[in-house]
UniProtKB/Swiss-Prot annotation:
UniProt main location, coarse: host cell
Organism: Influenza A virus (strain A/Fort Monmouth/1/1947 H1N1)
Protein name from the UniProt record: Protein PA-X
Stated family: Belongs to the influenza viruses PA-X family.
Domain text: The probable endonuclease active site in the N-terminus and the basic amino acid cluster in the C-terminus are important for the shutoff activity. The C-terminus acts as a nuclear localization signal. The C-terminus is recruited to host protein complexes involved in nuclear Pol II RNA processing.
Record-marked site positions (Important for efficient shutoff activity): 28, 65, 202-203, 206
ATP-binding found in the keyword field: no
GO MF terms held by the record: RNA binding
Any one GO biological process: viral RNA genome replication
Positions of the UniProt region annotated as Disordered: 202-221
Comp. bias regions, Polar residues: 207-217
Xref: InterPro entries: PA/PA-X, PA/PA-X_sf
Site (Important for efficient shutoff activity and nuclear localization): 195, 198-199
Amino acid sequence: MEDFVRQCFNPMIVELAEKAMKEYGEDLKIETNKFAAICTHLEVCFMYSDFHFINEQGRSIIVELGDPNALLKHRFEIIEGRDRTMAWTVVNSICNTTGAEKPKFLPDLYDYKEDRFIEIGVTRREVHIYYLEKANKIKSEKTHIHIFSFTGEEMATKADYTLDEESRARIKTRLFTIRQEMASRGLWDSFVNPREAKRQLKKNLKSQEQCATSPTKVSRRTSPALRILEPMWMDSNRTATLRASFLKCPKK
């Protein structure tokens, strides 16, 4: 699974996921399913935000790659992917600037057009079940919830899907492709089934004990589908800024 994740996702997303797991004391070499889930969630958050801007009239517009209007205001502020201290700093700044109610839990995005925080969910289960779990945890009508599944289903607060249909279809297509690629490599069943995942985890731990001192040969082959899809969605005008702000950390 780890090899798949490194081939499938944009390097910046992989790096952010590694930092997040390290922050919570989790080992990505062991908890590979969680590594994949974090990368998937991060990518959906970035895809949700990319190419969406607010013009001078306050209307939401979509600006594709290469468009000269780079100075337009980004519609969404990305909170997910930052370390907790910086994330809360961003949330507090937004609340102070906009007057928004401070959420109890860290949200994933802030929508400057609709003036609301957004919680993004990506689930391997039924969307309505995951939606209810999110709603029960957050317990706030101020935070908008939007859930996506790997089967193309989605659910959002008051059926308000925020994005246009094409933008949402792009996210759904990406999730479906990730699922298909996992399935083709025999990874999907353990990713979606907790019992199978635990069995795989025990197998990984045993394998690590046996091969702790042995060199590991890693396959670098990437399927044609992944070569096409890998980081193509990333807004190149924003990548450098995101890398600088998200990955900044003191050198030890």
